Amino acid sequence: MKLLNFTFLATYFCGVALYAQETSVFVVKPYLQDANPTEITVMWETSLGEESVVEFGTSPKLGKKAVGGAEDINFGPSRIHEVKLTGLKRFTTYYYRVKTDKLVSDIYQFKTPPFASDNESFNFLAMSDMQIDHQNPDKFNEIVNKGILPFLKSEYGNTTPDDLAM
């Protein structure tokens, strides 16, 4: 009986371990790169997985789909995904989510910039690769929570303005 219980428990825990290894998670949630009035690149990192799909549209119902690729990071199981969205309209709000196999993100939004000749006011925030600085481990949190968010609240109240591209 003890052998049977041990065999069952060993099988159960091996199964849980294998399932955990096969379940992808976001290492880095979706972020935007190289925005211009008619295209933008969406990137994200997962613990594993090949599929690189972005569903997008001008409403949260989405409706369009773009496919990209994924590459290994340092020859490990993590994958960085890249999908370019093209044919976008300038100065337009888009909604999107990313998919890698069974892993699906929340729905996010961004606004494409205007053409320079449009003479439209356009705000943006640029941040560099925020590597962990062991001398200042809370710097990114400080920049966002003590700088950017209080500024937006003082300028626009409790809502982010529509003309602020994210």
Predicted features, each with a name:
Residues 1-24:
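Bacterial Sec-dependent N-terminal signal peptides
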Residues 21-166:
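Divalent metal-dependent phosphoesterase catalytic cores across multiple superfamilies
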